[in-house]
């Protein structure tokens, strides 16, 4: 029934922070909330086998923080608020990956931390450039003020920084190097939750910036974004799928499969059409549900046979 808007602290937008829920954000909210409601009861047995007992409280704390960050990114209508929630969810995810009893999880979490920090830096630079040009952080107000500024170099630079930063967070090929180890060595409950939600919310934010803030003409007319996204999508689809064939561990195999599936979603965006965007949004939900279920299944397999090696 339209857009739901809530002004934090009773400060009306664009002066205050606005929570703004429309059809797309409610769609992603349902995905994240549904996955969390399934992973939480599943995690009880998973962490008992894969995380030291004295660290169980850390897992539940970080899961709650990560969920809060992902939901916040989805509902907020403020550009800097998106960055804050992005960092909250990312920092919680780094800790959850490192909680696994396998020592290789520490290296995986460190790799994720380094690449995630680079991505967050690019995002905040992009937000800073947009604030410099528009004088506002409210996404709806920013979209209106950007209309006469299309084609200016700071705005195009902001578009580039946001694209690279969010592509790292979404594991778009070739910025996916953090993902295979993080998914493979994290506890199964963490792999299931992160694979089903974290990259999907990053893709949602990318869509939100492309089609709500910048607008389609800005994204696809001023820069060769369609061609670039198309090449990266195809490379991810075929490259990651090929690498997955040669994996000897099921969690790593499906981690590379996730990179390929992100390529399918980016392929939909690269068309620059309503049909392509709709296809990407549908597959975003589809991939979140199926990949979360697959990693929960792999956790059950690991608990039964003692591992996920082929």
Across the structure, where does each feature detected by a protein language model lie?
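Transmembrane helix-loop-helix hairpins at membrane boundaries of multipass inner-membrane proteins
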Residues: 1-61, 140-144
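Hydrophobic transmembrane alpha-helices and their helix-loop junctions in integral membrane proteins
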Residues: 38-48, 65-80, 93-310
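Short, ordered loop/turn segments at secondary-structure junctions
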Residues: 84
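Short phosphate-coordinating micro-motif centered on Lys-Gly-acidic
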Residues: 87
């Amino acid at each position: 029934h339209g857009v739901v808007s809530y002004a934090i602290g009773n400060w009306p937008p664009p002066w205050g922070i606005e929570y703004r829920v429309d059809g797309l954000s409610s769609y992603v909210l349902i995905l994240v909330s549904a996955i969390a409601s399934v992973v939480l009861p599943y995690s009880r047995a998973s962490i008992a086998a894969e995380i030291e007992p004295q660290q169980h409280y850390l897992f539940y704390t970080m899961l709650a923080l990560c969920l809060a960050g992902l939901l916040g990114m989805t509902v907020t209508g403020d550009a800097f608020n998106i960055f804050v929630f992005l960092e909250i969810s990312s920092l919680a995810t780094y800790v959850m990956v490192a909680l696994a009893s396998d020592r290789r999880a520490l290296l995986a979490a460190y790799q994720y931390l380094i690449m995630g920090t680079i991505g967050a830096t690019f995002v905040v630079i992009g937000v800073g450039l947009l604030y410099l040009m528009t004088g506002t952080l409210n996404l709806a107000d920013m979209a209106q003020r950007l209309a006469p500024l299309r084609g200016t170099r700071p705005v195009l630079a902001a578009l580039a920084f946001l694209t690279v930063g969010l592509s790292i967070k979404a594991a778009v090929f070739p910025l996916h190097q953090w993902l295979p180890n993080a998914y493979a060595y994290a506890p199964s409950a963490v792999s299931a939750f992160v694979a089903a939600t974290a990259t999907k919310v990053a893709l949602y934010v990318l869509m939100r910036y492309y089609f709500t803030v910048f607008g389609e003409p800005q994204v696809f007319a001023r820069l060769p974004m369609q061609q670039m996204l198309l090449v990266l999508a195809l490379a991810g689809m075929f490259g990651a799928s090929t690498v997955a064939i040669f994996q000897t561990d099921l969690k790593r195999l499906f981690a590379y499969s996730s990179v390929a599936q992100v390529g399918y979603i980016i392929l939909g965006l690269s068309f620059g059409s309503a049909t392509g965007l709709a296809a990407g949004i549908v597959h975003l939900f589809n991939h979140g549900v199926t990949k979360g279920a697959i990693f929960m299944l792999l956790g059950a397999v690991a608990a039964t046979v003692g591992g996920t090696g082929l």
